Structures are given as C-alpha cells and as structure tokens.
Amino acid sequence: MESNRGSQNGIQLLLGAEQEAQHIVNAARTGKQARMKQAKEEAEKEIAEFRAYMEAEFQRNVEQTSGDSGANVKRLEQETFAKIQHLKTEAESISHDVVQMLLRQVTTVKN
C-alpha cells in the first residue's frame, strides 16, 4: 500500500506541476499577445504620422511648383517676345539685300 500511496503522491505532484506550467505558459502567451497588440498600435501610429508628414510635404511641393508655373509662363512669354523682335529686326536689316538678290536672279539671262 505504501508504494501505492507514494505513486499517488507522485502523480498528484506531477499533475500540480503540469497545472503550474500551464499557468506559466498561459501567462506568457497573454503577455506576448499584449506586447504584440501594443507594438502593432505603435507601428500604426508611426505609419499614420509618416503618411501625414509625406502628404504635407507633397502638398507644399505642389503649391510651390504650381505657383512657379505662372512665373515660368510669364518668363517664357517675355523670352519668346524678345526672340521674335530680334528676328524681325534681323529680317528688316537684310530684306533689302534679299530682294536685290532675287531680282538679280530673276532678271539675269543665262545661256
């Protein structure tokens, strides 16, 4: 009987140790889940902050470039006007010579 009682105590001791181990595992699992949830929330917060920052940068760049496009258009119009005036001036200065050359070519008879 003594051996029976000893084995009963051993079994009870093992069952108690198994339950304690199960509690430890469950506590560790719960802690891990809590840490994972917290890490996920922190990551989502950082992502949202970064997204907001990048959106603000993009909007600022759009405002700067769209504001500059009006100035660029005006500058290009001025440059184009200046080039047209320059070409007109050059054309006026050589138009007499071109007319004379054309008249000479038309009126000269070649055999």
From Swiss-Prot:
Pfam families: V-ATPase_G. Gene3D superfamilies: 1.20.5.2950. GO terms for molecular function: ATP hydrolysis activity; proton-transporting ATPase activity, rotational mechanism. GO terms for cellular component: vacuolar proton-transporting V-type ATPase, V1 domain. Keywords: Hydrogen ion transport, Ion transport, Transport. It comes from the Eukaryota. Catalytic subunit of the peripheral V1 complex of vacuolar ATPase (V-ATPase). V-ATPase is responsible for acidifying a variety of intracellular compartments in eukaryotic cells. V-ATPase is a heteromultimeric enzyme composed of a peripheral catalytic V1 complex (components A to H) attached to an integral membrane V0 proton pore complex (components: a, c, c', c'' and d). Belongs to the V-ATPase G subunit family. This is V-type proton ATPase subunit G 2. The gene is VATG2.
